[in-house]
Regions:
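Walker A/P-loop nucleotide-binding motif
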Residues: 127-147
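Walker B catalytic acidic pair
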Residues: 198-199
């Protein structure tokens, strides 16, 4: 800071005579400059004129103003982040029911959910090492819920995730020109994690198999992780019926660590609860 000489102090005092102070400001007699009543910091400084003799006294911000500005910027960034996450969820979770697949809604009945939490906790390493998961097992054992919890948790951390399935992808590809198809498939690389739900439910036509290969191969080449859920047995994936399936399954098995879901059928249990609730409703009598 410039030393306040008698000459400079005279200039300061002259300028102070016409200055307008805010309610939280005062002029400090010790230096004649504007200060903050709250923190005591300077809100005015002395700067030499460039290229000619003399000085001028511009405004500056004090510590509490700086903190308030930083808090405002942080709040704006939080708001932008929330809006960004909301947009990413709308894009990444294309079925509304997936919004409920969260760790907060986990009943604790499936011990495998600890692996889902661990995957999220170690996401940076999983992403760096291109580690995906292959969730296989019978219908209703919690594979989609497991994958959905990972998707929601990472999306909440502002990680781009897409959870979809091949019937949806194939439906989108229908009617597209070749160039548009390539662009659509390449768009999956915008997501740090790609989740393909229910592999094997799609029709195994030549066209479908070709498009599935393009999607999996594109992901494979991008060296970004994917999570696959399927009702197929691991033996079926390791011993595919033909070359078309082999090209797809080999890439999945190379990049995705298998996890077996062999517990109870949660979907059947939920259906039982639904039937009981429906029974209570239709059999109830109003007073």
């Amino acid at each position: 800071m410039i030393e306040i000489t008698a000459e400079i102090r005279a200039l300061i005092d002259k300028a102070a005579a016409s200055v307008e102070l805010a309610e939280d400001e005062y002029i400090d007699p010790s230096d004649g400059l504007i200060h903050c009543k709250k923190c005591g910091g300077q809100r005015q400084t002395v700067v030499p004129c460039f290229g000619k003799p003399g000085y001028f006294m511009p405004r500056c911000i004090c510590q509490c103003q700086r903190e308030a500005e930083e808090q405002c910027k942080a709040a704006e960034e939080r708001q932008r982040r929330m809006e960004r996450i909301k947009r990413r969820k709308a894009q990444g979770l294309q079925d509304r029911y997936l919004y409920d697949y969260t760790f907060a809604n986990d009943t604790g009945q499936n011990p495998l959910m600890d692996k889902a939490r661990a995957y999220v906790e170690n996401w940076k390493e999983a992403y760096k090492s291109n580690i995906g998961l292959l969730l296989f097992g019978d219908v209703g054992t919690g594979k989609s819920f497991f994958a959905g919890c990972i998707a929601n948790a990472l999306l909440d951390q502002d990680v781009p995730v897409l959870m979809t399935n091949f019937p949806t992808i194939l439906n989108r590809l229908t009617g597209m020109f070749s160039e548009d198809k390539s662009e659509f498939i390449a768009s999956f690389d915008e997501y740090d994690l790609l989740i393909i739900d229910d592999l094997g439910v799609e029709r195994s036509t030549e066209y479908a198999m070709e498009q599935m290969f393009f999607v999996i191969d594109s992901r494979y080449r991008s060296r970004r992780p994917m999570i696959i859920t399927t009702n197929l047995k691991l033996s079926e994936l390791k011993n595919p019926p033909d070359l078309a399936h082999a090209r797809i399954y080999d890439r999945i098995l190379e990049r995705c660590a298998p996890i077996l879901f062999d517990g109870k059928n949660f979907r059947e249990e939920n259906a039982g609860a639904t039937r009981q609730t429906a029974k209570d409703i239709v059999n109830s009598k109003q007073d």
